[in-house]
């Protein structure tokens, strides 16, 4: 264990919109917070900047010497280009130094006088701006696999970033209807089914490595993945146990199965009433947690068990018009009309359940800064059990595999941490 050390700012540079000037702000950033989330299509970075008036040489007409501050030189008035390279104590880097990576999204001025001012800025992915342009809206009709439609959306943004996508089983059709490209991606994810798994639901998000379009279930599949392991041993011990990558400095469980909320959202059992406009018939279908457990990839061995009183009882009723006949698939035939793989309504309801199940158990942990981690990664956490035994062992309930839903790298001039919001759908260590 190397001990806690600050993140090294290899590059923090902001560029003027008015000329070719740029300012290196590495020496004036007391706080930097870098964030990713599996629920966000773009990255955000919040920086506090101490502007001491030394950003650039002053260009006085009378030839007098001196310097001026960041706000006087660059002004930070709009969507300035921003470049960033970060490195942690292990040599892991986040490199967002291309011209097309980042833009200043928001500026707030905290305090100011003639000698010093404090500025708080939010930097976002350039695509957050590109997504708002009318010229980039989705206007055509799109037919194909979900991952192909997501590719089309990113082409509309003209992004140069990579896409890491799971192939979808079902062909779907969407009309553009002037959707924002990110809006199209978020709509498509709800009705996509991965190849080989009968469980709907994808996520679309950005990390420092690029864009991701992943199946919820395949995200929890451990096959072929490098999974970092962290252990909580208490503040008294600074040692990391053999076989672990780091120490959990702090943990807090935010929600351990909010069952009432799950009932209200129909996560365990939903009744779907489908009206077929072609034959004027009403069909009733039940989507329950048994189907979820049978078809889904879970993080642990033990899924929540309901009492006999409420088991297999529906808690949410949805009335929908069956989408039969509403899609023209030139590669399919008439027999495809009643194929459940093409039933967008049922698929969207199933994904609705899957999202709520996968995020049902949530906790926060803090570790030493580790820039190799990204939103969507799996980590293994070992927590001590609560007991009065002579020797404390790992908790068989709380320990196990979790997915990083949200990530924040936090750095000051003296120390740095990574905060992780972790989620999963079940308990225990999977055998």
Segments and roles (model prediction):
Residues 8-10, 41-43, 80, 98-100, ...:
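Envelope-exposed proteins and targeting segments
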Residues 154-159, 189-194, 381:
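Sec-exported extracytoplasmic/periplasmic mature domains
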Residues 34, 40-62, 73, 233-431:
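An acidic/polar, Gly/Ser/Thr-rich interaction patch typically located in mid-to-C-terminal regions
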Residues 1-130:
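Assembly/oligomerization scaffold segments
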Residues 118, 125-127, 163-255, 260:
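Short beta-strand-centered interaction patches in the first periplasmic/extracellular domains
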Residues 133-143, 170-176:
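Second-shell loop/turn segments in exported
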Residues 110-130, 142-163:
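Glycine-rich, acidic and aromatic/proline-enriched surface loops and short helix-turn segments
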Residues 132-137, 153, 188, 376, ...:
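Subunit-assembly interface segments of extracellular/virion macromolecular structures
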């Amino acid at each position: 264990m190397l001990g806690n050390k600050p993140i090294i700012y290899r590059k923090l540079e902001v560029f003027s919109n008015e000329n070719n000037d740029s300012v290196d702000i590495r020496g004036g950033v007391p706080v930097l917070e870098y964030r990713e989330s599996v629920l966000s299509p773009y990255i955000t970075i919040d920086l506090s900047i101490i502007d001491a008036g030394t950003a650039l040489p002053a260009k006085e007409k009378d030839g007098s010497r001196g310097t001026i501050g960041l706000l006087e030189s660059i002004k930070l008035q709009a969507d300035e280009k921003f470049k960033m390279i970060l490195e942690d104590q292990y040599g892991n880097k986040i490199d967002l130094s291309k011209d097309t990576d980042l833009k200043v999204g928001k500026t707030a001025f905290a305090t100011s006088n003639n000698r010093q001012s404090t500025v708080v800025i939010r930097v976002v992915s350039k695509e957050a701006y590109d997504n708002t342009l009318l010229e980039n809206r989705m206007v055509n009709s799109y037919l194909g696999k979900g991952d192909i439609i997501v590719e089309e959306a990113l082409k509309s943004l003209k992004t140069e970033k990579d896409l890491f996508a799971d192939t979808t089983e079902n062909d779907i059709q969407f009309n553009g209807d002037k959707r924002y490209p990110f809006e199209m991606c978020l709509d498509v994810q709800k009705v996509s089914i991965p190849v080989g798994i009968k469980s709907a639901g994808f996520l679309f998000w950005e990390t420092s490595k690029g864009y991701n379009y992943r199946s919820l279930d395949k995200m929890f599949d451990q096959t072929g993945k490098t999974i970092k392991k962290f252990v909580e041993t208490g503040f008294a011990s600074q040692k990391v146990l053999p076989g672990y990558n780091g120490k959990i400095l702090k943990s807090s469980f935010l929600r351990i199965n909010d069952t009432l909320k799950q009932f209200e959202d129909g996560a365990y059992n939903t009744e779907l009433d489908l009206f077929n406009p072609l034959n004027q018939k009403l069909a009733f279908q039940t989507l329950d947690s048994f189907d979820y457990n049978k078809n889904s990839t879970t993080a642990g061995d033990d899924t929540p068990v309901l009492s006999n009183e409420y088991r297999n009882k529906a808690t949410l009723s949805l009335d929908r018009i069956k989408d039969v006949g509403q899609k023209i698939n030139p590669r399919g035939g008439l027999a495809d009309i009643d194929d459940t793989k093409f039933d967008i309504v049922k698929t969207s309801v199933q994904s609705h359940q899957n999202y709520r199940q996968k995020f049902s158990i949530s906790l926060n942990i803090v570790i030493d800064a580790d820039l190799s981690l990204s939103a969507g990664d799996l980590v293994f956490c070992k927590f001590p059990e609560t007991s009065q035994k002579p020797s404390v062992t790992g908790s068989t309930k709380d320990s196990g595999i979790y997915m990083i839903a949200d990530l924040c790298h936090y750095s000051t001039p003296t120390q740095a941490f990574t905060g992780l919001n972790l989620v999963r759908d079940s308990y225990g260590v999977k055998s």
